[in-house]
Amino acid sequence: MSATLEKTSWWQHSALKWLAVSLCVLFTGYLVVLMYSQGEYLFAMVTLVLLGMGIYVFSNRNTYAWRYTYPGVAGMGLFVLFPLICTIAIAFTNYSSINQLTFERAQSVLMSRQYQSGQALTFKLYPKSDLWVLALSIPSQTKQLVSEPFSLSAMEETTLHVYEQDNLENGEAATLRIITQNRQALNQLVVVLPDGNRLKMSSLRQFSGVHPQYSLGEDGESLTDNQTGTLYRPNTDTGFYQSVNAEGTWGNETLTPGFTVTIGWKNFLRVIQDEGIQKPFLAIFVWTVVFSLFTVVLTVAVGMVLACIVQWEALKGRAVYRVLLILPYAVPSFISILIFKGLFNQSFGEINLLLNGLFGLKPAWFTDPTMARTMLIVVNAWLGYPYMMILCMGLLKAIPDDLYEASAMDGAGPFQNFFKITFPLLIKPLTPLMIASFAFNFNNFVLIQLLTLGGPDRIGTTTPAGYTDLLVSYTYRIAFDGSSGQDFGLAAAIATVIFLLVGALAVINLKATRIKFD
């Protein structure tokens, strides 16, 4: 027997594989160390776990089958499960625009604050060779306090002594433009007066006495206001430094920025107990369900009727009508939404111009809640009916012609055929798709954001809420558009509720399609 030697390609060599794995490990390891050094421990841990699992799967011959499923599983974990877990975790904290720092960082920010005291002295800068001389003017005196020549290139804090001088500095002083350009360097100067007082730059024209606003207590946590003597302690229930009364009880004054703390179920209880949140939340929830339901019913009805029409063999030019009716589905939705926003313009839109010319009507599409909601449903039906029409066109092909021939022999007309044969045979396979469409429109953020921005706004609410807001857009406005600050914790709590609602819809969808779990 002659042995046959198989030649291995260069890219199949094991050394190349291990070289690629080594480079991947080094690069990802560098990213992990970088994230860990920046304090992003969770991201570093997730990256490390995914890297370790990936190396194990792709380097072990016993896990060969997992090589095909691991990318999908890793992607689902990274882009679905990880954000979901983070959102749920944030829902149990007070994380917001004023409570997004750690306790140590918030304390450091407060300790860096300063206040001005004493007399402010006007200053001028005079060039001297490649250096500069600082001259401070003493009010009601002809004397000046002049420094030794110094450089503005130093970026670290520099102590600068000044001395009295009878003769005023001659020469042209630096312009405001030069001072502005060197403001960062001037802010690093600590001017020491002959009496020992220290001054720092307080404006583009003055140096004044600056002192720390707060001093740290012996316990390493409490702060004392050096101006008022007020004592502040960290309140771990609210996430703020809060004033303490003489009796040792909490006062009403708090310091910002605050810090992030775990508050348990308080965000969820706010949705239930706070009337300023409860009322708009319940109203928006009802409107979200109504909007999704009306959209599904309208798109299915229009799509089914149009599908029956374009499939009618006696209709001439069916192919042309079919293409024209599918065109709205081919245009990107955000373009169609912006076009409709112009068409529905209350002052210059073509729709109002037409209605005003024919009937003398000019509906307030964007300021009247009822008209705004009607506009949303109409626009969404326009965007969604082509999808349902395509589905119905395919399902109509599966209906046997014998049924229509038998009904014709019994003397049935088009309407009887539709309601007795077509509709019952179409609605059953459409049910799971209708549930999926309902779930999609439940979170139809793009339509609301581009067309109405949730408006018109509701009056008397503690959170930004509008009459056309869906739960998802309401959550977005709480997280990013709140006038009193961005409340990420409350938004995450509402997002968690939305997740549970959509999850319930998914379960209903699975039951409707008769998928059983072991």
Swiss-Prot record:
InterPro entries: MalF_N, MalF_N_TM, MalF_P2, MalF_P2_sf, MetI-like, MetI-like_sf
Keywords recorded for this protein, A-Z: Cell inner membrane, Cell membrane, Membrane, Sugar transport, Transmembrane, Transmembrane helix, Transport
Membrane topology per record: Multi-pass membrane protein
Compartments, as annotated in UniProt: Cell inner membrane
Transmembrane segments: 15-35, 39-59, 72-92, 281-301, 324-344, 376-396, 488-508
Family: Belongs to the binding-protein-dependent transport system permease family. MalFG subfamily.
Oligomer and partners: The complex is composed of two ATP-binding proteins (MalK), two transmembrane proteins (MalG and MalF) and a solute-binding protein (MalE).
PANTHER family (UniProt xref): MALTOSE/MALTODEXTRIN TRANSPORT SYSTEM PERMEASE PROTEIN MALF (PTHR47314), MALTOSE_MALTODEXTRIN TRANSPORT SYSTEM PERMEASE PROTEIN MALF (PTHR47314:SF1)
Name of the protein: Maltose/maltodextrin transport system permease protein MalF
Species in which this protein is naturally found: Photorhabdus laumondii subsp. laumondii (strain DSM 15139 / CIP 105565 / TT01) (Photorhabdus luminescens subsp. laumondii)
